[in-house]
Amino acid sequence: MFETILIANRGEIACRVIKTCRRLGIRTVAVYSDADAGALHVEMADEAVRIGPPPAAESYLNIEAIVEACRRTGARAVHPGYGFLSERAAFARALEAAGITFIGPPVAAIEAMGDKIESKRLARAAGVSTVPGTLDSIADPDEARRIAREIGYPVMIKASAGGGGKGMRIARDERELLEGIARARSEARSAFGDDRVFLEKFVEEPRHIEIQVLGDRHGNIVHLGERECSIQRRHQKVIEEAPSPFLDKATRKAMGEQAVALARAVGYHSAGTVEFIVDRHRNFYFLEMNTRLQVEHPVTELVTGLDLVELMIRVAAGEPLPFRQEDVRLEGWAIEARVYAEDPGRGFLPSVGRVVRYREPHGKDIRVDSGVVEGAEVSIHYDPMIAKLCARGHDRRAAIARAREALDAFLIRGPAHNLSFLSAVLAHPRFQEGRLSTGFIAEEFGERFRGAGLPPERLEEIAGVTVRLRLDRARREARASGKLPGWRYRPERDWVVQLDGVCFAVTLLADEDERSVLHIVDRHLEVAVDWRPGDPVVRARVTGSTFTLQVDPLPEGWIVRHGGAELRALVRTRRAAELAARIPEKVRADAGKMLRSPMPGLILSIAVQPGDEVKAGQDLCVLEAMKMENVLKAEQDGRVEEVRVRPRDTVAADQVLITFA
């Protein structure tokens, strides 16, 4: 076994690997860029080495610096995590040349599977089902048109060296084909230094289902079942689960056998994932093989009871797998939700900034993998994922319920985040029924998230909770010293709660230290809360139901977050509500007269010029930030007055890019 392992990564995956190494008694070395000098993975490791400035190309992708860090610290093995250098054959080869063990597959397997075109050839040769399409990169637009006509629209444009959703586009006609190839090549060139793209038939209503494989250096290869990864946005996975609610035993067995056959064909050892797309008839087609640990590996760990990182380390040390295929058992159900620093209300644009408050949910069968602590900075330079929240249940319904409750209790303040959006996805009837496809988010939520709806009964209960909070606050204030002699607390009887414009008349029937009895609409509610002033997380008990919500104070109430909804709750006495109704509301300033940059980044292109008439939703410019090309669109119809930036300009967060007349 290794004495010291260097983790060539950052964030939650570096922390995840360190935890397993600690349990195994292995010393760990972290590497970090200047932007990550105070990061959690640096703090957790036994030793840390600076490898360069913030840009990944000068730090986490710097092979020479990482090999030198191994030499300096005596690390005889490297775990690459995922992303960065994890699938770079040149990195594995450099470690091998330095006498350092790469905790991953052999170089030949990385090379074979790293090229999407070559991997498809190998898959066909190994008897794996593949999607109709070309096996060669596209030479020119004429060839692209010809191939698309042969296999039929829609087609998928894919970067040969691609991954993580980058360099991928769907084209439904010739115009989209030519535009998509140009955009995919640009994105692939920027992300991978390789602008080759190829075409394949796009499967309508596809599911994205992958098989986890694991092999040792002694020729033993097994699969650990599947993961359902169909909930995606712009080809990036958002929610994953194991097992899939769609597969039957026969399809699961066939997919597992083909995944193992492909792994065996390339002499694979370590952990890897064979990805398939599956149509509505359970026909499945090879997509790609990821020769590394996947982001979503925890759901497999939760249903198998295995530690994949430990097994990778033991395999790299030459140990055989301690079990065979017939020993693999899948028990229960697990769901993972990726928590991103992004703004769902602004087209899911990445968000940056300091994490002002951070507290993870805890409880039975809840797991959070994170590289963030309170006070950490979400940087422009790296992927905006904050954490992965995982929940396990005895069945799918129980796992979903546990995940929803945990999301409600997950406290994050600072950068914008997608917790409410994740809750809304899990609550959606179509998700709960398991009717999934990779188009689910686009079909059900569109390009921006405007909050989930809540049933009337839950709104009534939330109204009751906000009144109880108001009474609790008044009761605490009454206990403060310095009150006038003879003054004592007398709770108001009649209240009006306004939840985003919907008014509830609330009558206080009884008020005690532990609970309040309220009449709302036609219900008598017994309300109790577990809450400390200053803490946004509230545990509420309302006449037989228990739920969690978060509150942030307003002058006359709270911003309430629960179940994917964000509500403005104004809590007034009946008299105050009557007076407020007579006061005219202030007219808000028109913020639609300018387009501001949502984050620091680089302007790649501008699609408009002064005098142009634009429609709501029209593309205005492309901003490169956090490893992605983000298309900024018009909020409303209007006419361009001034364009204040040019392509290749570096812009700051909130900088005005375009103004409108």
Residue ranges, per PLM feature:
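Catalytic P-loop NTP-binding/switch module of NTPases
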Residues: T546, D552-P598
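N-terminal beta-alpha lobe that positions the nucleotide/phosphoryl donor
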Residues: M1-V274, V278-H297
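Short acidic-glycine loop/turn motifs at beta-strand connectors
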Residues: D173, G215-N220, D279-R282, H362, ...
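Catalytic cores of soluble metabolic enzymes centered on carboxylation/carboxyl-transfer
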Residues: A259, P298-E526, D619, A653-T659
